[in-house]
Regions:
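Conserved NB-ARC/NACHT P-loop NTPase core of NLR-like innate immune receptors
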Residues: 1-191
Length: 191
């Protein structure tokens, strides 16, 4: 069996519009389900967690979920395990102490500290200060796609094409169209 065939992949997308996709508990639950579906041995570990919590009548806390994930990841003989966490910045930096985002960053740090040679993490996020500071000591490779000048040009080009092709704006003077493009590009702030 090749590495590609034996590789495990689990994916989680943080979504600011869906509170069920914004915290450590949701992340860990999703990763556990995805990984345990790959083999009976992994499913048995998850079933143990289920049994510990009165066959599902009690919800496991984040500590129990993390312990279960750790047990699954530590099973010998597994191929490469890729955990992809997309849009971490959509995990709210709320008023909780610690905030949902801080808890998530601590969970990621704990995953890295496991030091498992077959575990690979890929985390995507906008370059928000707290995330950058927390992840900086943990990353071994970083790809920055945040090129403000290129992003601003793309936004400007898009707005320009919409403004100049919109039938309702045909009668507008060119300098008014240019002002709209300039202001919208400015207000978009890279979004």
């Amino acid at each position: 069996m090749s590495d590609a065939e034996s590789a495990f992949l689990a994916y989680f997308y943080f979504d600011f519009k869906d509170t069920a996709k914004q915290d450590s508990r949701a992340l860990l639950s999703s990763l556990l389900i995805q990984l345990s579906n790959r083999s009976d041995q992994l499913c048995d570990v998850l079933h143990g967690l289920y049994s510990e919590h009165q066959d599902g009548s009690q919800q496991p806390n984040t500590t129990s979920l993390f312990r279960c994930l750790k047990d699954i990841l530590a099973i010998g003989g597994l191929g490469p395990i890729y955990l992809i966490m997309d849009a971490l910045d959509e995990c709210p930096n709320d008023s909780g102490i610690p905030s949902s985002r801080e808890k998530m960053l601590m969970t990621l740090e704990e995953l890295v500290q496991l030091g498992l040679p077959n575990l690979r993490l890929c985390v995507t996020s906008r370059p928000e200060y707290d995330i950058r500071i927390a992840l900086e000591p943990l990353v071994t490779q970083q790809v920055s796609l945040h090129d403000e000048s290129g992003q601003k040009k793309d936004i400007n080009d898009y707005i320009t094409s919409v403004v100049h092709s919109d039938g309702k704006m045909k009668r507008w003077r060119d300098d008014d169209k240019d002002m709209v493009v300039e202001k919208l590009t400015q207000k978009a702030d890279g979004m």
